[in-house]
């Protein structure tokens, strides 16, 4: 009989047991302080269709004011518990075979019955534990320990006293992306552990093709790592005081150390890492990097299409997406691909049934991405012998980029920090990496509020607070840059002011989300770059004599462009200012949602919710 938790506390750790009814464990996570108790029900282990199981797979950490049912449906992580047990049984049997050749690194193995890939070399006695004669390995307890932005994580305990992590992606960007990302993530973690000797979880098995694999869900089964997230110590808005620098560096230094390791290997192409059997035959002949002396590693990984999320955001079919995902021999080709992908997305959206307002906005976005497409091929000087950029060759070499480098994805284990998540990891030149997302800030740089902000001392506390936040975010970036300089001095040119401005249209396009108004960020960066183009060309930082769009040819045309951009930006800012929770696309943490609903501040409006007017 299976014990499940329902009416889940927001952001709580939910556990149910498979065996005798045992004590239900619920340990609240720090991120939200919920004290809502969990109710329990039971389900038969032999009945996959028992509706009692359903609540365990539902998304519970928040509610959307608009399209809540649709958003939550995308985040349902239903999987076959029976399939998990079948997978564990195969892993257990494989571990016994591995014991016979413990010193041999074997290639990943495709299991025809499970329709999944196993990594035999990671399966041993220590991993799987020991069973009594005639006993089968089974899951005895499951815990939902994390509901993230893009995936959900379950902890599985077994009757061998060993625990595992089951990681399931949400279906936010379509089946094809989930298949791509799970294959690339597994290979990237394997590469980091075996080639670079980094602390990452071992991958035991992974499966794409949710319709056919044993779990009936795209999944990764991996090592469970004990410890606290670095996020527990991360306070980006801590005020300057004795010990504040040390507090910030206690998080940023371990992350900078991880980044230094990620950058050690330079590759032969731009794209993403995969196991050899997961890429097309034509891509298997090329080595991912040069100089490998370990014969067991030589053909283990290959470079295939980029797994960066920007190419997959629209949930398009494979044949539509793969036109843009590489792999590429030249760095600038990836920049062009990002522009082409963004433009393609807008053009496909224009074919839908639209309101006049939607069509107008999309046509504006199309104009901007066409401008970016014109600039992309010459965004940087291709002849690095002419460029005034220090260490330009180093900055343009293919290096591993992990977008999820974040204190939320690093566990402080007794053995040291472990990087848990490499979703969307890709190979691109360091000059195009940008800041880690948790440090990103594009506003005014303030290094000292009293010196850089006129009249700061006479401002009200509320006004001062706005500038304080700008200062703190600038300070955090500066600490990160200092850490980069200490560890990778040859790459510090990537944070030069000119380089930041040149690459910003590209980074803005990479960051584009579901809101089509993101074109305004791309346009803003293009406008700023156009004004500095001649200066940057003099130093051979950019690749064309003149900024390659027509509105930059005359002062009148440029001013008209600026005015139109300003009007669009004001209209958009006015719109989102009147939309509650616009920064989270209408998502409200569940504890907060429950409180506001009880207070009558949030009220139901059909299938949506609205904020009640005073």
Swiss-Prot record:
Main subcellular location: mitochondrion
UniProt keyword terms in alphabetical order: Mitochondrion, Transit peptide
Subcellular location: Mitochondrion
GO cellular component: mitochondrion
Stretch forming the signal peptide: none
InterPro entries in alphabetical order: Aminoglycoside_PTrfase, Kinase-like_dom_sf, Mito_inheritance_9
Transit peptide (first-last residue): 1-39
Pfam families with a match to the protein in the record: APH
Superkingdom field: Eukaryota
Family, similarity comment: Belongs to the AIM9 family.
Designated name of the protein: Altered inheritance of mitochondria protein 9, mitochondrial
Organism: Komagataella phaffii (strain GS115 / ATCC 20864) (Yeast)
Gene: AIM9
């Amino acid at each position: 009989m299976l014990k499940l938790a329902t009416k889940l506390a927001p952001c709580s750790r939910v556990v149910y047991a498979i065996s005798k009814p045992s004590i239900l464990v619920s340990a609240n996570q720090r991120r939200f302080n919920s004290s809502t108790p969990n109710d329990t029900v039971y389900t038969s282990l032999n009945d996959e269709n028992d509706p009692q199981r359903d609540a365990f797979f539902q998304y519970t950490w928040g509610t959307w004011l608009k399209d809540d049912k649709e958003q939550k449906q995308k985040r349902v992580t239903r999987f076959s518990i029976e399939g998990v047990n079948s997978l564990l049984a195969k892993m257990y049997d494989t571990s016994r075979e591995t014991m016979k050749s413990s010193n041999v690194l074997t290639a990943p193995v495709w299991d025809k019955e499970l329709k999944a890939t196993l990594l035999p070399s990671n399966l041993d006695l220590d991993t799987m534990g020991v069973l009594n004669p005639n006993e089968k390995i089974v899951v005895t307890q499951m815990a939902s320990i994390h509901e993230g932005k893009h995936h959900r994580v379950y902890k599985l305990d077994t009757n061998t006293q060993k625990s595992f992590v089951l990681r399931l992606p949400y279906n936010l960007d379509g089946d094809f992306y989930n298949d791509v990302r799970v294959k690339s993530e597994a290979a990237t973690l394997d590469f980091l552990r075996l080639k670079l000797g980094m602390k990452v979880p071992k991958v035991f098995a992974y499966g794409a093709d949710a319709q056919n694999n044993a779990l009936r869900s795209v999944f990764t089964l991996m090592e469970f790592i004990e410890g606290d997230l670095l996020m527990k110590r991360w306070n980006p808005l801590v005020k300057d005081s004795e010990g504040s620098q040390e507090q910030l560096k206690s998080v940023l230094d371990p992350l900078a150390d991880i980044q230094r390791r990620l950058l050690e290997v330079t590759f032969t192409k731009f794209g993403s890492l995969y196991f050899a059997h997961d890429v097309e035959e034509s891509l298997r002949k090329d080595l991912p990097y040069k100089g490998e002396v370990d014969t067991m590693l030589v053909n283990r990984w290959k470079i295939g299409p980029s797994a960066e999320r920007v190419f997959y955001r629209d949930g398009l079919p494979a044949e539509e997406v793969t036109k843009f995902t590489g792999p590429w021999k030249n760095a600038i080709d990836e920049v062009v691909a990002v522009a082409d992908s963004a433009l393609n997305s807008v053009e496909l959206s224009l074919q839908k049934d639209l309101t006049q307002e939607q069509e107008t906005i999309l046509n504006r976005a199309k104009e901007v991405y066409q401008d970016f497409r014109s600039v992309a091929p010459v965004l940087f000087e291709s002849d690095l012998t002419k460029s005034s950029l220090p260490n330009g060759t180093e900055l343009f070499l293919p290096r591993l980029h992990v977008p999820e480098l974040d204190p939320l994805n690093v566990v402080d284990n007794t053995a040291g920090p472990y990087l848990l998540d490499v979703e969307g990891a890709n190979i691109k030149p360091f000059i195009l990496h940008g800041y880690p997302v948790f440090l990103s800030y594009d506003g005014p740089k303030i290094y000292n509020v009293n010196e850089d902000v006129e009249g700061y001392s006479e401002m009200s506390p509320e006004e001062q607070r706005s500038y304080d936040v700008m200062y703190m975010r600038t300070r955090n970036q500066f600490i990160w840059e200092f850490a980069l300089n200490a560890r990778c001095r040859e790459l510090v040119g990537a944070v030069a002011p000119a380089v930041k401005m040149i690459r910003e249209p590209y980074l803005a396009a990479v960051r584009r989300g579901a809101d089509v108004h993101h074109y305004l960020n791309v346009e803003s960066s293009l406008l700023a770059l156009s004004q500095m183009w001649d200066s940057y060309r003099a130093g051979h930082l950019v690749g064309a004599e003149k900024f390659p769009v027509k509105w930059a040819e005359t002062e009148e045309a440029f001013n008209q462009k600026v005015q139109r951009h300003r009007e669009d930006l004001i209209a958009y800012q006015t719109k989102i200012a009147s939309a509650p929770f616009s920064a989270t696309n209408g998502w409200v943490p569940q504890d907060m949602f429950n409180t506001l609903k009880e207070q009558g501040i949030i009220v139901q409006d059909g299938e949506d919710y609205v904020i009640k007017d005073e």
